[in-house]
Amino acid sequence: MAPTDVSRHTLSVLVEDVEGILSRVTGMFSRRGYSIISLVSAQTENPGINRLTIVVDASETIMEQVTKQLNKIVPVIKIVELEADATVARALMMVKVAANNTNRPQVVDAVNIFRARVVDVAQESVVVEATGAPGKLAALLDVLKPFGVLELVQSGDVALGRGPKALAPPRN
């Protein structure tokens, strides 16, 4: 497989909320040597059903194999690959930035430009919370780096397809 064949893919996977399902899904990737870029698991609007948002860099051939293998895992209900142009994807980033009385106004100005927010202020630092598309978060981080990034944590992407169509019909 040539490196040019590899691209970023986002899978939305509905699973029954049963013990060990996350381990079984990640184990399938691990056993086959596939790398997960990010994985988010959360409850859906339907009790007992979770949505896994899995981001991977892989070729189309590998993605076909991944989908086939995931479909073999019994508590998996449905798998959809979300196309980038038909998807709303967001992540959460929290950054602790060195900020004292002298440079704090510049840090806050940068945060405001990105519509992020300061969620904690200490004498020598601030904690910034931002949500958005990966590009926006990367751009904010680039702006904050010159001030001094003390700590950084970022969630994986969560994503939904655009428009009225849902992955699964709502339960009544």
Tell where the protein language model's regions lie, with residue ranges.
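Long, contiguous binding/interaction regions
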Residues: M1-N50, V55-N172
